């Protein structure tokens, strides 16, 4: 945690699958979590940082999750479920929602930062702003972030090439 003048006490929530696929589909590159962390720490105190990912028995995934932990994220994993019809399931929306609501209720946190383009979170952001008065910031890939989510946030930051590896 950063010492000195703190502009915001923030909680960061990363929908890892959403960020992975939207940056890959738009830029064919990966998101730079370390750079994001540095940018956020320059202007705030990170009280909580959760990254929500899918647990797969893959060496690259294990290295990635270890890197996230090294940066400072709590990595929350859910099993990867392959259905008989070939589709896959690994949705963290409810888990993210529960954790965001708990953080918003925490008097030590005044800003919620969400990395996702998923429009399902728009109601969540509207609710926590109305109920707890927290500031909400969304990071998402342009054209792949739901307008309803952008409109629900106090601030929207486009994930551009400068935030990629």
Where are these regions (language model features)?
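Domain-level signal for Mg2+-assisted phosphodiester chemistry and nucleotide/NA-binding surfaces
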Residues: 1-92, 105, 134-136
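Nuclease catalytic cores that cleave nucleic-acid phosphodiester bonds
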Residues: 57-165
